[in-house]
């Protein structure tokens, strides 16, 4: 009988104040921090079978395919065994590597993107997304 091995890591991914928030199709920015935003990763291994469970404080896990592919390549776990979940939080930033471009699912879904600060928003969101995605890998590597 194989032994079940379990690993768990939780990392803080609280964004900087002023970043644009996602949800309700309104332009809102982070003005304060009530609770930290987090990424949690649980790794399960039993014999040859490995599974990763990724939970992230985000409205939607738009980057789920990228996360699954990246973790699969790094750890040799089939993408079908990597489960990505968003907590559907309406007080967190957008997680979108392509924000501001036609490839962005967020841009396609939002009618309220045009603001005087859009260029700054794009830069902040893309930058935060890179940090966020790196922390997903860090948590899985823990």
Predicted regions and their residues:
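Conserved beta-alpha junction segments in alpha/beta enzyme cores
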Residues: 1-142
């Amino acid at each position: 009988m194989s032994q079940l091995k379990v690993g768990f890591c939780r990392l803080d991914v609280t964004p900087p104040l002023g970043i644009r928030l996602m949800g309700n199709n309104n332009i809102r920015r982070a003005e304060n921090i009530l609770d930290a935003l987090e990424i949690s990763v649980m790794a399960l291994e039993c014999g040859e079978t490995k599974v990763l469970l990724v939970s992230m404080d985000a409205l939607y896990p738009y980057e789920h395919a990228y996360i699954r592919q990246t973790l699969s390549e790094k750890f040799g776990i089939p993408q079908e065994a990597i489960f990505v979940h968003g907590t559907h939080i309406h007080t967190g930033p957008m997680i979108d590597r392509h924000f501001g471009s036609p490839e962005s699912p967020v841009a396609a879904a939002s009618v309220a993107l045009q603001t005087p600060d859009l260029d700054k928003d794009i830069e902040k969101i893309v930058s935060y997304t890179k940090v966020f995605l790196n922390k997903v890998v860090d948590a899985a590597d823990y």
